[in-house]
Curated annotation (Swiss-Prot):
It catalyses: [PQQ precursor protein] + S-adenosyl-L-methionine = E-Y cross-linked-[PQQ precursor protein] + 5'-deoxyadenosine + L-methionine + H(+). The keyword Magnesium does not apply. One of its GO terms (molecular function) is S-adenosyl-L-methionine binding. This is PqqA peptide cyclase. Interacts with PqqD. The interaction is necessary for activity of PqqE. Keywords: 4Fe-4S, Iron, Iron-sulfur, Metal-binding, Oxidoreductase, PQQ biosynthesis, S-adenosyl-L-methionine. The lineage of its organism: Bacteria, Pseudomonadati, Pseudomonadota, Gammaproteobacteria, Moraxellales. One of its GO terms (biological process) is pyrroloquinoline quinone biosynthetic process. InterPro entries: 4Fe4S-binding_SPASM_dom, Aldolase_TIM, Elp3/MiaA/NifB-like_rSAM, MoaA_NifB_PqqE_Fe-S-bd_CS, PQQ_synth_PqqE_bac, PqqE-like, Radical_SAM_PqqE_MftC-like, rSAM.
């Protein structure tokens, strides 16, 4: 199937699942600890070569924490030579002035640093790591020093959303150019912890109001900082156009070489190919995995005849699978879905008090335990 299939313009290279942090909202798979056979430097070079030949123009380096890879600078340099626009998506842990300097020399175009909270204590508690806030703060200053645009990302959830004003103030203190205030998206560990992370509707309305007030203040001051507020689809009545459609422009390569149409698709009961076994072109145009939800032939009636199908492409397949057990079902976010009550139930559960101590942190011990127990809830273990 090649007719009507677009180019894979955006390549996400998940270099590793290893990470020094333990964020309970991480989108990595719960069983990430069993996926250890990472692509080599040369194998990544080959992936980049093929993707560029196919028309890919933007390359994101992600993880896990991509800075764990000691060959990151080599990978960036190779991508730069090919003409990619390169973006490092990082927690800032493992970043040093020397590495920033080397990445700059290698041709890295963009660095996005994530924070957990504006308060150091809350930030480090959510990260499951001591001194994480201090490290991030210092790296932000160095990113500015090396003339990168300052792009900060905060995953917003019920434990930090009420400090949205302080979060924005921190970003202004750091001279951020762009701030993404993204309400938690519930995949991987975030889905496991959904009840403890989903903000209430009241919290969400307040946070968006405060963000809009800051936007007006910044506009009046002719301030360059741009605030982006990403709402959760759990409070919508129509689904998002996930990844702008399955297999339309987005290509993810997992650490072990599995090729995916989005970073959450690994959990689906679908066979996805590996770049060690097939070319990217064959994977993109011919593989069952990438063609599975292209077009509308797969859609159940109701979705197929819906006038919005060309806008939302049926919503998120991973979300449909996680909530209903069948990835072909209508995304339960949709108010027309037979499963919309599951979203309404999640909204109701957000009103139940939940402390940080009830969250399951993302670390290898919990991942291994989850893998062994296979869907039996894991204990809350925080690695020292």
């Amino acid at each position: 199937m090649t007719e009507g299939v677009g180019l894979p313009l955006w390549l996400l290279a998940e270099l590793t699942y290893r990470c020094p942090l333990q964020c309970p909202y991480c989108s990595n798979p719960l069983d990430y600890a069993q996926h250890k056979n990472e692509l080599t430097t040369q194998e990544w070079f080959d992936v980049f070569d093929q993707a560029r030949q196919m028309g890919a123009v933007q390359l994101g380096f992600s993880g896990g924490e991509p800075l764990v890879r000691q060959d990151l600078e080599q990978l960036v340099a190779h991508a730069h030579q090919l003409g990619f626009y390169t973006n490092l998506i990082t927690s800032g842990m493992g970043l040093t002035e020397q590495r920033i300097s080397h990445l700059k020399q290698a041709g890295l175009d963009h660095i996005q640093i994530s924070f957990q909270a504006s308060d150091p204590v809350v930030n480090d508690a959510l990260a499951g790591s001591k001194h994480a806030f201090e490290q991030k703060y210092e790296m932000c200053r160095l990113v500015k020093k090396y003339d990168y645009p300052m792009v900060l990302n905060f995953v917003i959830h019920r434990h930090n959303i009420d400090q949205i004003d302080k979060i924005i103030e921190l970003c202004l203190e750091l001279n951020a150019d762009t701030v993404e205030l993204a309400i938690c998206q519930f995949y991987g560990w975030a889905f496991l912890n959904r009840q403890g992370l989903l903000p209430t509707q009241e919290q969400l309305i307040r946070a968006e109001r405060i963000t809009n007030e800051y936007r007006e203040k910044l506009k009046a001051q002719n301030h360059p900082c741009k605030l982006i507020f990403v709402v959760p689809d759990y409070y919508e009545e129509r689904p998002k156009a996930c990844m702008n459609g399955w297999g339309k422009i987005f290509f993810t390569i997992a650490p072990d070489g599995m090729a995916l149409p989005c970073h959450a698709a690994r959990q689906l009961p679908i066979s996805f190919p590996n770049v060690r076994e097939q070319s990217l072109s064959k994977i993109w145009y011919e593989s069952t995995g990438f063609n599975h939800f292209r077009g509308d032939a797969w859609m159940p009636e109701g979705c197929r005849s819906c006038p919005d199908k060309d806008r939302d492409f049926g919503g998120c397949r991973c979300q449909a699978y996680m909530l209903t057990g069948d990835a072909s079902n209508a995304d339960p976010v949709c108010g027309k879905s037979l499963y919309h009550q599951l979203i309404e139930q999640a909204r109701a559960e957000s009103e139940i008090d939940s402390s940080l101590g009830k969250l399951v942190f993302r670390n290898s011990r919990n991942s291994k335990q989850f893998t062994v127990q296979q869907n039996i809830p894991v204990q809350n273990i925080v690695d020292d």
